[in-house]
Amino acid sequence: QQDTILFEFKGCEHLASGLNTITSVETSSTASFVASGINIEEKEKQWIQNISDRLQTLVGAKATIGIERLNANISIGLQDKGFVIKDAQLPVELARAIKSQEEMKCIHSSLQATENGVHQLKKSIKPGISENELWSVLHQAIIAQDGDYCETRLLSSGQKTNPWFQETGPRLIQENELIALDT
């Protein structure tokens, strides 16, 4: 099978316009608690039926399919429909590790934006600034360079640096304090 189908959120189908790696774009249905609330089981049943019908057309009944990160009820439902379920995390991660020239350009651009953002952050360190204010300098600098969001707010100061993995907060930075940043 050479076709690549992108199931996109309703109203976002246009985002794939012009991508030569996508054969067709279809509106996705969502089976998450956020989208479905207490009706999640009904949404999961609809999702199972829709994707099961599609899979039977594309690869046949009782085919082996790889799944990465899917609701347990959906995996069970697809098994009940006769599909053989395999964990696809390993092959998916190995495939993600291979980078094209375009991806390498994006990574390089991201690193430049991050380095420039960290430089701006370092210049903004002063007693009395809150961790949140200091964090916002990094985020603003990265976005101003057409970068993307910062995923985890791992900047802390003083006693908050140990134990590690405490997110940025309203704490005011004091003179001669250690400031820890994880990019």
Language model feature labels by segment:
Residues 1-113:
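A composition/biophysics-driven feature that prefers long, compositionally simple stretches
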Residues 17-34, 120-122, 142-148, 176-183:
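A short, terminal or domain-edge coil/loop segment
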Residues 20-23, 41, 81, 101, ...:
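Generic preference for flexible, low-structure residues
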Residues 74, 87-94, 98, 129-183:
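Short catalytic-site patches enriched in acidic/histidine residues
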Residues 111-119, 131:
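Active-site pocket-lining segments that scaffold enzyme catalytic pockets across diverse folds
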Residues 122-129:
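C-terminal helix-coil-helix/basic helical segment that borders enzyme active sites and/or dimer interfaces
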